[in-house]
A protein has these predicted regions:
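Short, cationic-aromatic polyanion-contact patches
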Residues: 16-22, 37, 66-92
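Pre-recognition alpha-helix immediately N-terminal to the DNA-recognition helix
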Residues: 24-28
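A short acidic, leucine-rich amphipathic alpha-helix
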Residues: 40-43
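Helix-turn-helix DNA-binding motif, specifically the short coil turn and the N-cap/start of the second
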Residues: 48
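Glycine-centered, phosphate/nucleic-acid-interacting loop/turn motifs that mediate DNA/RNA or nucleotide
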Residues: 63
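Amphipathic alpha-helical dimerization/coiled-coil segments
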Residues: 80-140
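Charged, low-complexity intrinsically disordered regulatory/assembly segments
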Residues: 125-216
Length: 216
């Protein structure tokens, strides 16, 4: 499967630029909410504006965000995301930049965790109709690598059948449609022993991020 037109395929420079949780979150906020300033983004993340401004400049140098010159002025710079998705599946790059690759994935994982906590905090104030769609589950499986890859492709096929959250799709969405995010974690555990009890460990909830990693 190939990257979509609005995706950025991470190279070494982009990978190193995103190897920080604040930068992953900044890109996510710009993708989710549109152009913004360092001050406003800093308020959302709970950091000072100087920190946000520094990280935005680093992201800009890597080509992941850019100044929105139509909005900016001499007093305040506006920033926007250059892409809507992040594509990272370069095995050779991982071997060349193992520390940056790990730091990036750890940053993404931290962002997912933060978004999960945010969703949980918002759950009680959600309308009941949306609260009933909230889910957080896990299924321990015993698969071969080939079966795991097939599962991944099946999950992607299911997601592709639904309306994506893009500006064009949002304009044509039916009444009542809201942003709804799905995060998948496929976690190999090759050294885990076989379970003997057959206990179902499933739970129920759901998450969201805009700094997602895709792989073909």
């Amino acid at each position: 499967m190939t990257p979509q037109p609005d995706s950025v395929v991470l190279d070494a420079k982009g990978l190193r630029a995103l190897a920080h949780p604040v930068r992953v979150q900044l890109v996510g906020l710009l993708r989710k909410h549109g152009p913004s300033t360092a001050t406003r983004l800093a308020e959302r993340l709970g950091v000072n504006s100087g920190t946000a401004s520094y990280h935005l400049r680093q992201l800009g140098a890597a080509g992941l965000v850019e100044e929105d010159t139509e909005r900016g002025n001499a007093r305040e710079r506006w920033w926007r995301s250059v892409h809507q998705r992040t594509w990272f599946n370069d095995h050779e790059l991982v071997e060349r930049e193992p520390e940056a690759a790990l730091a990036y994935l750890q940053s993404v994982a931290a962002t997912y965790t933060s978004r999960t906590q945010q969703a949980l905090n918002e759950l009680q104030t959600m309308p009941r109709v949306w609260r009933d769609t909230f889910d957080m589950s896990d299924w321990p499986l015993r698969l071969t690598p080939e079966e795991a890859s097939a599962l991944y492709e099946e999950l992607r096929a299911v997601m592709s059948r639904y309306r994506q959250d893009t500006p064009g799709a949002a304009a044509q969405a039916p009444e009542g449609a809201e942003r709804f995010s799905v995060i998948t974690h496929l976690l190999p555990e090759p050294d885990a022993p076989a379970t003997s009890t057959g206990t179902d460990t499933g739970t129920d909830a759901g998450t969201d991020t805009d700094a997602g990693v895709e792989r073909p």
